[in-house]
Amino acid sequence: MSTLRPFFIDTDTASDDAVALVMAFARDDINIVGIGVVAGNVPLASALQNALYTRELCGRTDVPVYAGADRPLIYELGTAQHVHGDDGMGDIGLPLTGRAPNEGHAVDALLEASNEYAGELTLVTLGPLTNIALAIQRDPSIADRISRVVLMGAAADHIGNVNPVAEFNMWVDPHAVQIVLESGLPLEFVGWDISRRDAVIVPEEANRLRSIGTPRAEFTIDIQRIVAEFCARDTKLAGFDMPDPIAMAYAIDPSIATQTRHLNLVTECAEGPTRGMVVMDLLGFTGREPNAVVVMHADHSAFIRQLEAAIS
């Protein structure tokens, strides 16, 4: 086995995804074998440019970045540009054009990585699950080759950020979520509830982190400009929350989770007020076997320490 842990990251790169990538790029104990990009927070072309810019900023052009699905399996794409800005990166004037991804499709790259690193690969998903569902449809045996799948998505308290009960990543492509939940993959969910409670960056923390003064530190805070406005106006948080970075922090160091549960999860695919809701059987009413680990609580201080180390 390799001494480095192989990670494949799938992302719809916008402001919080980019910080999660910064955190992964900073690690010397991880081999990022590929980054797949999917439409979600922003259209695919923008998500690609955001990933490529972040890769360049971190000096990690050795890591391949692949274009994936540009739309959900069935529904039309709905983006979160009202949350992250038109460009997904806070609309602060970054030069987000002109970079080309690696040749090949994200789904093919994921399948190849699952074969090359069978039994070792950690898959981290930061966006809609379209690419993952397509990989499962292509080769269901992928479930036997991946060691961990850490997903940013859903919410154990069933509070939503795109409708009353659905988290955005799950809402965008609920049919993909259903395929993933039924796949047998070893799933570990870090939900929006964890982000709202355990990964909120209050203004004092944001100022301190930015004052580290590195390009990565300034980038990490500056691209949250539109997100911070959204959180103050709509989600009523004391600062801005960091869903994808807390998921990445857990993928890197599972001890950041202070409580987890094994639960049965199903999703609502139908259009309507509960589209994209991931129903977690917290009391075991259904009697169905658990199909996922769900993080219930995380250590905010440990998260901040990991983030600070990555941007210093």
What annotation goes with each model-predicted range?
Residues D16-M23, I74-Q81, G98-P101, I142-R148, ...:
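Short, functional N-terminal and low-complexity linear motifs
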Residues G78-G85, N163-E167, E204-A206:
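Short, surface-exposed amphipathic charged segments that create phosphate/polyanion-binding patches used
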Residues S2-L52, D87, G93-R197:
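Active-site histidine-anchored catalytic micro-motif
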